[in-house]
Amino acid sequence: MHQQKRQPELVEGNLPVFVFPTELIFYADDQSTHKQVLTLYNPYEFALKFKVLCTTPNKYVVIDAAGAVKPQCCVDIVIRHRDVRSCHYGVIDKFRLQVSEQSQRKALGRKEVIATLLPSAKEQQKEEEEKRIKEHLTESVFFEQSCQPENRAVSSGPSLLTVFLGVVCIAALMLPTLGDMESLVPLYLHLSVNQKLVAAYILGLITMAILRT
């Protein structure tokens, strides 16, 4: 006798539930957002029953709060905010979707969706923009602090002008003095004693400046 193949028993509460979106945001100044849609997907090979629960049911109207989803199908659940008041701004409410097999009452899985009422979409965008600017400024400050020691290390050495003047003064001291007839250096490169004294003085100043850096 052929025995019918039985479906393995599912463990209560462990079945993944697929819902989109997972967050609902209602804007007080935009009536088009006061009614939103949750889509419940059933990727399984058996039908599912579902039920929608809410932490604050007096604030919302849920159309088709209970029903069934055929195998590998989806169903839309319409949620409407009916208590749009400033005292509810920023309050986080929760919806819970529970699913079970049609032939059983125990919940096989559940998924929570949060809902928030905000005063304005523009205000929300402004807050997000301010947050991005603060993050950018924080990153900029961090970047400057990271580079600052390196910049100080680079600027701590002698400048190119200082090095150039030092080389010129050394070269001037090595040139022959006026009246030195045995030198092979052209006469126009011969320096007077006073000129060499000036070069030596400047070289001394440069040396002191380099030692202080």
Swiss-Prot record:
A motif (Nuclear export signal) lies at residues 205-208. Pfam families: Motile_Sperm (PF00635). PROSITE patterns: MSP (PS50202). The chain crosses the membrane at residues 159-179, 191-211. GO terms for biological process: negative regulation of transcription by RNA polymerase II; positive regulation of transcription by RNA polymerase II. Gene3D superfamilies: Immunoglobulins (2.60.40.10). It is a multi-pass membrane protein. Plays a role in differentiation and/or proliferation of mesenchymal stem cells. Proposed to be involved in epithelial-to-mesenchymal transition (EMT). However, another study suggests that it is not required for EMT or stem cell self-renewal and acts during later stages of differentiation. This is Motile sperm domain-containing protein 1.
